[in-house]
């Protein structure tokens, strides 16, 4: 995992429902904790593109449902600015399930992956079909 330079627009607060964009068996997950969150007192933690977080599986196969898993955000609906000045926004909020060390649990990713997530997580970039 590499660091991200500059400030990041975090568009997914606690409790956000996120589409799972891989083939692990989870379809919908709910954000319950953001890893490495250092925020202000009483501020609700939020995750942005490339952040690792803990989630609860809400919809999916019976084996996956109600499990607590780690995931990385690969798309977010809230617009964010890149260093070259362009604004990026996706159609949905999506994440892929990973192990605590950052290894991807699935073998394929559906839909595009944000460049910020691909640069930070090389294992995600390796199996991504489209990087935007």
UniProtKB/Swiss-Prot annotation:
InterPro entries assigned: Ribosomal_uL14, Ribosomal_uL14_arc, Ribosomal_uL14_CS, Ribosomal_uL14_sf
Keywords carried by this UniProt record: Ribonucleoprotein, Ribosomal protein, RNA-binding, rRNA-binding
Record CDD domains: Ribosomal_uL14 (cd00337)
One GO CC term on file: cytosolic large ribosomal subunit
SUPFAM superfamilies the record matches: Ribosomal protein L14 (SSF50193)
A GO biological-process term: translation
One GO MF term: structural constituent of ribosome
Gene3D superfamilies linked to this entry: Ribosomal protein L14
Keyword Magnesium: no
Pfam family membership, one: Ribosomal_L14
Described function: Binds to 23S rRNA. Forms part of two intersubunit bridges in the 70S ribosome.
Subunit structure as annotated in this protein's UniProt entry: Part of the 50S ribosomal subunit. Forms a cluster with proteins L3 and L24e, part of which may contact the 16S rRNA in 2 intersubunit bridges.
Family membership noted in the UniProt record: Belongs to the universal ribosomal protein uL14 family.
Protein name: Large ribosomal subunit protein uL14
Name of the encoding gene: rpl14
